[in-house]
């Protein structure tokens, strides 16, 4: 499985704290989103949100980014602009650097 960062943002108007329709989606899907993602072979590792910036970062594992794209199109993606980015851990970066330096 690959590691991905999902960077999202929404307008102040689309914020679930300000928008009843978005809030309804959050309340409907939020409590069960980890389970729903798991059914699509997506493991949600962490979910971070910045209320002041109206942005979020979720870290997930999945076999490919298209699974994530499809899942979010029916969920959080309805009211957010999304960017799905492949990630590696910092320890992976260190290991790659060691290989380049023949450690």
Q: Which ranges hold each PLM region?
A:
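A generic structural motif
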Residues: 56-58
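An amphipathic, aromatic/His-enriched active-site/gating alpha helix that lines ligand/cofactor pockets
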Residues: 61-93
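Short S/T/G/P-rich N-terminal loop/turn motif that feeds into the first structured element of a domain
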Residues: 1-54, 63-66, 92-103
């Amino acid at each position: 499985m690959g590691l991905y960062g999902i960077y999202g943002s929404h307008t102040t108007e689309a914020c679930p704290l300000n928008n009843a329709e978005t809030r309804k989606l959050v309340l409907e899907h939020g409590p069960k989103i980890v389970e729903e993602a798991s059914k699509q072979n997506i493991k949600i590792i962490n979910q971070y949100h910045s209320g002041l910036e109206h942005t979020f970062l979720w870290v997930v594992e999945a076999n490919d980014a298209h699974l994530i794209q499809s899942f979010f199109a029916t969920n959080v993606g309805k009211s957010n602009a999304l960017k799905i980015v492949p990630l590696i851990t910092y320890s992976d970066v260190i290991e790659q650097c060691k290989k380049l330096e023949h450690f």
